[in-house]
């Protein structure tokens, strides 16, 4: 079954700035933030909205500089107003699926090989990236690493001053571990994963509509 979701880029600007809380020496901001961003130093994480969190007490926060992550944390006191830097307690983090955006006909990419079902539960744009909360099926403890890719399908010009529509497809390859693999159906589980793909070069300077397409299976597996 084919699904699509439309996103207006003007809304994405609002999403990316929702948690841009001002930082002052006396402020304490007791809330949980869940954001995409990058590792910007030892134990430092900067969100797409410009917040920087210091996870000095998090032993498990051991990622290379520049790694893109999805992080949930409890935000604490302001450390440096000039840098919008806060102390924070890490709740959890994950490395999202990512990769360069491809186009139909790209050398080495055969879209027909990426035909397994994937579902999009949420999507937003921040930091020049399309961020997606996805689900697919796989067999428990199989060890198989499934693959997802993001395909730019083209642009439709708006009529009568309407914004242009940019179409993207999220496609998936279960590597033989998915719903229709013929494996033990009783051992199938739902796998939830974040994905993030750089879309800045495709976005116009003005407003646009993003049309996102993906394929999921019906209850009978088709």
Please annotate each region the language model reported.
Residues 19-22:
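C-terminal motif of bacterial Sec signal peptides marking the signal peptidase cleavage site
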Residues 2, 32-222:
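First exposed extracellular module after export/assembly in secreted or surface-exposed proteins
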């Amino acid at each position: 079954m084919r699904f699509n979701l439309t996103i207006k880029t003007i809304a994405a600007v609002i999403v990316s700035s929702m948690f841009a809380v001002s930082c002052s020496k006396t402020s304490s901001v007791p809330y949980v933030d869940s954001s995409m961003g990058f590792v910007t130093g030892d134990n430092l994480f900067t969100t797409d909205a410009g917040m920087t969190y210091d996870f000095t007490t998090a032993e498990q926060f051991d990622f290379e500089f520049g790694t893109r992550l999805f992080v949930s944390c409890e935000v604490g006191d302001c450390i440096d107003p000039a840098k919008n830097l806060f102390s924070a307690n890490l709740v959890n983090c994950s490395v999202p699926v990512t990769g360069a955006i491809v186009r139909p006909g790209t050398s080495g990419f055969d879209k027909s090989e990426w035909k397994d079902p994937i579902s999009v539960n949420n999507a937003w744009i921040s930091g020049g990236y399309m961020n997606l909360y996805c689900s697919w099926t796989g067999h428990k403890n199989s060890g198989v690493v499934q693959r997802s890719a993001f395909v730019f399908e083209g642009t439709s010009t708006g009529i009568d001053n309407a914004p242009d529509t940019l179409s993207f497809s999220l496609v998936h390859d279960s590597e033989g571990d998915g719903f229709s693999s013929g494996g033990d159906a009783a051992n199938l589980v739902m796998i939830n994963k974040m994905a993030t793909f750089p879309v800045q070069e495709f976005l116009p300077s003005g407003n646009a509509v993003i049309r996102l397409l993906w394929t999921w299976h019906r209850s009978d597996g088709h």
